[in-house]
Amino acid sequence: MADTTRQKTVVIADYDYGDVDIERAIIEAAGLRLITAQCKSEDDVIAAARDADAIIAQYATVGARAISALTRCEVIARYGTGTDIVDVDAATQHGILVTNVPNDWCENEVADHAMALLLAAARKIIRYDQATRAGVWRWQTGEPIHRLSGGTLGLLSFGAIAQAIGRRAAGFGLRVIASDQALFKALSQGWIAGAGLDDIEEEPAKLRDWTPANPLFGLDNVIITPHAAYYSEEAIRTVRDFAASEVVRVLTGQPPLSAVNGVQVASARRAADSRLTAGAPT
């Protein structure tokens, strides 16, 4: 018989917000217990969340091995939209819901950041700043710079964020292309003079120890920011509130608002119930 008096537990596997006050207020108000950790490996996740009823993760990997070790987990919530840190197929096989935060939580922030990187790269802002601080007061430091108006901006996709970037770019007189063939031509023929990146391949925030050895850091025509495009105080509050509220909804018997595998888990549960019913004595 299930223990209906047991207090359910939520484990925040990792976070870099400085505190969990927002999450704690939401989770404890629902009568749930909150435990926090700073997991940097699947072993860390297993140690922290083996008996948890729910997990919230920012960067920590919750892979198949960790999922198979979970004894009570009902839901894994991601701080953010992408769920690449979670093995969704493994979670589905174990009947665990995986939730995310719909993309509009930081749509404007990412579009603004992309335009900031574009403008900084196009106008050689970093190069000018470094030269000026070093005592070099010459406009020629940035040569060559070309006007944006009449130029072309290539987008790798044309989802909501890309469309928001396109609207902003149009205000600067840029022609927007979202054609793979056109973008390939621009890249392969060397039309692109610089790059603005909000992350690098190794995603330093996921690593226990990191040193800036990526060769991109040695290029003066590349601007790199630390996966910060989504950031604004308002966006951070939204993502934390939504993730915490999702686990509360699931653990209190309500449907989540943004489950990436909700249909599959519901189908698997119905199939399991049917098998139990078919095998029950008459």
Regions found by a protein language model. Give the residues of each.
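N-terminal glycine-/charge-rich "phosphate-binding" loop or analogous flexible N-terminal tail
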Residues: 1-52, 268-282
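Structural motif corresponding to alpha-helix initiation and N-cap regions
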Residues: 20-21, 39-46, 60-64, 85, ...
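Short gly/ser/thr-rich secondary-structure transition/capping motifs
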Residues: 34-40, 57-58, 133-141, 182, ...
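A short, aliphatic-rich alpha-helical micro-motif
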Residues: 48-49, 67-70, 148, 216-217
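Phosphate/diphosphate ligand-binding glycine-rich loop within oxidoreductases
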Residues: 53-129
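Rossmann-like dinucleotide-binding domain for NAD(H)/NADP(H)
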Residues: 99, 177, 181-282
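Oxidoreductase and adenylate-handling cofactor-binding alpha/beta cores
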Residues: 111-130, 167-174, 241-254
